[in-house]
């Protein structure tokens, strides 16, 4: 069974040496988080990387959120 992230992220040694990229692009996932981390907006990222669709960026954020929530033990939740 395919996981949701399998349609979102591609890791292929033939594409940027296996760097995780948005599926259907050559845009590394790391670039997205670097943009957000430096205070750039989602729209600025999408403008500079037009092969990434807005829906892909939102799905990546949702996936990252789910991973973080899964990693936090229940006893640490206030």
Language model segments and positions:
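Long, charge-rich, low-complexity alpha-helical segments
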Residues: 28-78
């Amino acid at each position: 069974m395919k996981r949701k992230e399998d349609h979102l992220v591609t890791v292929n040694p033939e594409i940027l040496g296996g760097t995780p990229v948005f599926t259907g692009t050559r845009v590394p996932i790391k670039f997205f988080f670097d943009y957000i981390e430096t205070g750039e907006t989602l729209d600025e990222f999408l403008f500079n990387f037009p092969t990434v669709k807005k829906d892909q960026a939102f799905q990546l954020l949702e996936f990252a959120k789910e991973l973080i929530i899964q990693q936090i033990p229940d006893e640490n939740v206030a």
